[in-house]
Amino acid sequence: EIMPSLVGSEMCIRDSNNGQGKTNLLEAIWLLTGGKSFRGGKDAELVRRGEPFAVLEASTLRAQQEEQEPDEPNRVRLTVGTPDSQRPGRYASVNGAAPRRAAGLAGSFPAVVFDPGHLSLVKGAPEGRRKFLDAALCQLYPGYLTVYRRYLRALQQKNALLRRSPAGQERPYAEKMALLEVLNTELAAQGEAIQQRRRAYLERLAPLACANYEELSHGAERMELRYAAQFEPGGLAALLKARQNEEVRAGQSLCGPHREDLELLLDGQPARVFASQGQQRSVVLSLKMAEAAAAAAITGEHPVLLLDDVLSELDDGRKQYLLTRMREKQTFVTSCDDTAFLKTDGEVYRMNGGVLSKI
């Protein structure tokens, strides 16, 4: 048990060297959301080398808990097993209930994480920006994860069907087209739901993010967020039918929400092409602060902020902006830089060899 009880406050964690366990702590807190590690990689990489599994135990207290007394926390036990263990993967038990897949925690512990790797949101591939939207939606609307998984399952089946099979193993054409029609029907239903949720969320997120950017840049540029859709609402089924022969020739799916993008613009120009390093940081910081504010507006509850070594990536102006916004909600922030915490009112801890101690 290395963490004190912190409610509605800032917790700053520092060390003089990398590799002492700061990020591991934030990663452990993030896993309570039901999401995968924000650093990527496989679940098995969360387990200490040579061990069959890892265990995380925590108590969380939400601002609104309808089924419990106001001061009664949720006791969460999360296990991560390697492929060779008795229970591979991530499983979670809440208040002594039977373990279930950790993804079932979605929505029970709201959090927003920001680490230097998120700068790729601007100049990286569209997949990263789609994941940004989908991860936020999974926390806000637990049912979204079910829809998203159904879509991915149908998409995987469709791509397997479209792939050219070895000679002599190809399905009869009529059978292939019949299966394709069934899968396209499922993709149209789930894909429409995915796009509808993304569009609605973006309507809330965009004004917040753009206002944040204007404040950060002192009005130097105007930021815009635009959903780059392949189809209008209600039009996915027709699009899938129209491009069916093209997909058969290509051997893969070519349309749907998995091919769409979130465009980030500065003064009408694509940020992925023209944004400087400083502008990229401002865009991502604006998005992450907007993600937290949108979650608070939708749920009535501020998510926990997890900021992993991002202060050192920011200039003084952006750093002061972030430190000011940190005061609005519970925040865990890590840094190797002592000066990063000079202007914070939060409690400061040192992490050394995985051991946390108050300074």
Question: Locations of the language-model features?
Answer:
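C-terminal lobe/lid and adjacent interdomain/linker elements of RecA-like ASCE P-loop ATPase modules
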Residues: 64, 81, 317-359
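Nucleotide-state sensing region of NTPase/ATPase domains
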Residues: 33-128, 132-140, 144, 206, ...
